[in-house]
Amino acid sequence: MSKRDNLYLVGLMGAGKTTVGRLLAKHYGCTFYDSDHEIEARTGVKIPVIFEIEGEAGFRRREEAVIAELTTLSGIVLATGGGAVLSPANREHLRTNGLVIYLRGSPEQLCERTRNDRNRPLLQTGNPLAKLRELYQQRDPIYRELADVTVDTARQSVAGMTRVLYGKLDLLKGEATSFDPAG
């Protein structure tokens, strides 16, 4: 399997990974996966329930197993959970099996996008903006180091972000091995 056969989206919660991922999969004729949705489908419960019963560590173990499995597939677009990059094993799977796309948004922007979403356990706090700032501080350097492509989501529509991504991915196609979802 070529590194360019898969696209993996990383970024904080609310960055648009699932929405953009679906559009990329449609555009390139790939199968779309969302690691959080896969975990929910396999367990039969929502992410907050897993956090409540198993804690974040239990959820991260499940996430690691799902990412290890999905990254063996070819011709996929995968939206990862915001904290997936905290695992060295996940970073290695993503780095070696596909192109990593970082959707970077400011904590303020992401707080606005997620303010009514109760399916995000880490934001169920008295100050979600402070939590997003903390997560950004912790994870942004990891996302940047891992990413083959970074797109700033500030003041961009989903259509605008995907246009930027198509252009950047087309440029990458000209380098070494090209992205070819057909394998």
UniProtKB/Swiss-Prot annotation:
Keyword presence, Transferase: yes
Protein EC: 2.7.1.71
GO terms for cellular component: cytosol
Record-linked Pfam families: SKI (PF01202)
Broad enzyme group: transferase
Places the protein is found: Cytoplasm
Biochemical pathway: Metabolic intermediate biosynthesis; chorismate biosynthesis; chorismate from D-erythrose 4-phosphate and phosphoenolpyruvate: step 5/7
Cofactors that this protein relies on: Mg(2+)
Binding site for ATP: 14-19, 120, 156
Annotated residues for binding of Mg(2+): 18
GO terms of biological process kind: amino acid biosynthetic process; aromatic amino acid family biosynthetic process; chorismate biosynthetic process
GO molecular function, one term: shikimate kinase activity
Keyword list, A-Z: Amino-acid biosynthesis, Aromatic amino acid biosynthesis, ATP-binding, Cytoplasm, Kinase, Magnesium, Metal-binding, Nucleotide-binding, Transferase
Alphabetical list of SUPFAM superfamilies matching this protein: P-loop containing nucleoside triphosphate hydrolases
Domain of life of the native organism: Bacteria
Binding site for substrate: 36, 60, 82, 139
Keyword hit for Calcium: no
Catalytic activity: shikimate + ATP = 3-phosphoshikimate + ADP + H(+)
HAMAP family reported in the protein's UniProt record: Shikimate_kinase (MF_00109)
Family the UniProt entry places it in: Belongs to the shikimate kinase family.
Role this protein plays: Catalyzes the specific phosphorylation of the 3-hydroxyl group of shikimic acid using ATP as a cosubstrate.
SUBUNIT field: Monomer.
Identification of the protein by name: Shikimate kinase
Recorded name of the encoding gene: aroK
